[in-house]
Amino acid sequence: MAASRVVNRNRWCRRHFPFFAVGVAILVVQVFLGYCFYTVPSSDDGADEYAVARTRHEAGKSSSESQGSHGRQQSAQSDDEYDEEENPARQRPVARRGATPAGANASEAVDWSQLGFEPACEITEKDALSAIRRATSLHCRRELANVTCLAQAGMLYPARLPRSCESASGREAVPGRSLGCYQDDRQQRLLERLASRSRSNGLSHCVGLCLRLGYPWAGLEYGLECFCGKGAPPPQERRLPDDRCTMACPSNATVSCGGYLALHVFATGISSVPTKKESVWPVVGAVPPPARIAFLLSVNGRAVRQVQRLLKALYHERHVFYIHVDARQGHMHRALLELESRLGNVVLARERLATIWGGSSLLEMLLGAMERLLRDHPHWDYLVNLSETDFPLKPRERLEEFLAANMGSNFVKSHGQDTQRFISKQALERTFHECGGRMWRLGPRQLPWGLRLDGGSDWVALHRDFCSYVALPERQDALLTGLRSLFGHTLLPAESFFHTALQNSAFCSSVVDNNLRLVNWKRRQGCQCQHRHVVDWCGCSPNVFRPDDWHRIRATRDRPVFFARKFEPVVSRRMVDQLERWISDPASEASMAAPVVADAGYWQSQYEPLDDDATVEDHQLTAYQSLTRLALSRAEFTCSRPPEGGPHVRGVSLYFYGDQFQGLLVSWGSPSASTEAFLSPRNHQRNGDADLPVSARLRLLQVGSQYDPKEQMLRDFPRLLGPRSEPGALHSWGAGRALAVTFVWVDPAKVVAGSYEVRVESGPQTLFHRPDFRKPLRPGAWTLLVFYEWRLVGQTRFLVLPVVPAAVGAEAAAEVNGGPRGPYIDHDLSRVEEHLGYSRETRAALKAQADTDGRRTGRELERWVDALIAEFWTFRGACSIRGGDAAEDDRCGARLPACEKTEWSSFSYEATVQVGPAPT
């Protein structure tokens, strides 16, 4: 019996021993990994210093929710927030170009002699090396190298800055004051956020980190850990004896950093009671005198009429309007000079900067404008900055009353609660430098200690006293000097500079978390990284309001929100008309429905030869000249044929009606006798097989070169393409099942340039397809065919214009107009050509004709261009621009109607853009 028990025991041991051994091995591995995790050193430099952790309630969220931005509330958004790729595997190639092989010296890997200079230091940062290589000018390369050397030497930014906020009172306001040792719990942390786990942990490090992130309490635990928290001080029932918090700090063994589940809590100097003010709203009772406002307009582009309309909505003699026009926009600046000469309180900046998106030049412009206003036009209470895409949501009088009732407050919109997320997405821990029209990323940096960092929207309403503090050199202190140094090399600096200056200065108790704006965020469309051509980062921009967004406008009726953005009449003038009617008509404002407005026209300059920013392309100039000849041939002009090339084009404008592009308005002639003609593009879209259900689903098929992914539209409204253009297809689909269609591009010689399969998902959608063709494209009439299972769904024809020698020179024109020297792409497309029924003989004949056309010059080239233009454009009418001698209007033919009385003319009267008293 005993022997049987021994045998059974041995058998049981043999059977279960492997499981026991595996369990012991797993336990040993877990202990080893835990030891490594708590003892691994952490770098004190760069963006990873305190990029630990989410709050405990965030830990259960999916990674897509914690990293995405689409589900967050509008109040938590910065106005131009970045969508940084946090996964290293998804980082952009531009960030890797400066990398050098392992073990190689990064500076030695650069051939500085080829770059034209030798830097003052050994540059090792890969982002800086990448930027220097990509810069196109020697001056910019030197600037980038000098800034990098200063940053590497620790001479670019101050290590610590003073904070003079006095909003908190008593002992709580003393940074570093000990509250004692407290019992912590893994399941219910005393302080909710683990800010860092680092071997650099210590009292000053943890307190400074929590101060930076906006927490009133900092806690040290287990030597390596730093926690931050908000709300009331820790409860006394969890208080422990001080000897439980005696574990040495890894950075300084003479200082203790808490203990095991024992948290040593300190004050950071921020009040535990929220200090942001509540604004007075609604304004009732006795109202003080209206606030005087300095409206600072930073405008770009060519939407002159929209700027005039904005000024008309806000204009009053008691206010001052300071307008900064981007240095690249000569047309806008010249058009607004008339207002300055007529209205004494409208001032145009003479020191103009090219304020690129995200650039430090924007902050430089804002501070410079503030200084000029304070010195030259000092009689104002508030500064409100606007752009050409802003428009008021309420009458001007209500804004004046609101600011008067809240005199002394500063209105800025903060990013929300998660400062660390904002720091990461805004790239605040990286050095940037602006030169050559681009913001270059130069590498990581250490932010100054001692600051409460804040940021959000760069659209603000600031009191005059605060503007004096930040803008006047004689008012600057150590804090302002350091902040200007820091934000002079920061991406989107205006989104953080004013917020941070307010939070750390004597003005910290004047902050109202409301910038008085409604911003139309649609992040799935607006976060398309469309600014990478001017910045080494990825960001978002708000969308233009359309009639479908009226419910968002209507929801602001009873809120202290006075402006909205963005509005663009080339996208929707109707929205601006509705809004203007809503705020000016009490009956409309009382109604929840959108006001009914009639269709109206909108005009915007496309080209003027006198503009210093004229960037017209060769083929566009060719088109404008040909359009004037087309107008002359269709109108009943009796003058002799104009000289070769046609009359001198004085201007070209875009014309819209009912939010639809109608055509181009081309003017020519002399100041005393000019003519404007209206020409419209023909519609060449055709449906395919009527028996194919997919054909009815294709709603729009257009070809252009300037696609806006944010607005899902083509920005080159005339869709004028040349041999060097990059054509793409905008296609819109109705609801239906997912399918794959084939896009076939055919040139004028019936050569299939490319064939591509494009996926169309279920449901309504707008997509853009851009092929990559070798250049130059063959001039002439192209065809784009869309097939489903090789049955025709739809097609459209589009024009690729040749260029004339006057634009590029005879030799260059012949080379460009001759088409490609080989195939457009490296694929055999003969099967597609056979399917389309294009015989070799037909293609050979068309190719020979195309080669002959490409060699045309002089009048023959003009006739070819004019024939192509006439095939794709139609003449709609002409009018006379009356000059000094009205009799000369008849010199070139029958009497034409006056443009001032012609509905479609850009010279017709428009009351909505008449600013101030009528000129005498």
Question: Where do the protein language model's features map onto the residues?
Answer:
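GT-A fold catalytic core of metal-dependent nucleotide-sugar glycosyltransferases
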Residues: P234-Q236, E371-F422, W790-V793
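Acidic donor-binding segment of Leloir-type glycosyltransferases
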Residues: A313, E317-R350
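Active-site-proximal specificity loops/subdomain of glycosyltransferases
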Residues: L339-D381
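Contiguous segments within soluble domain cores/interaction surfaces
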Residues: F678-Y788, L792-T920
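Catalytic core and acceptor-binding pocket of nucleotide-sugar-dependent glycosyltransferases
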Residues: M407, H415, T419-R552
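C-terminal catalytic/acceptor-binding lobe
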Residues: L486-A677, G916
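Peripheral, non-catalytic regulatory segments
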Residues: G103-W281
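N-terminal signal-anchor transmembrane helix specifying type II single-pass membrane topology
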Residues: A2-K61
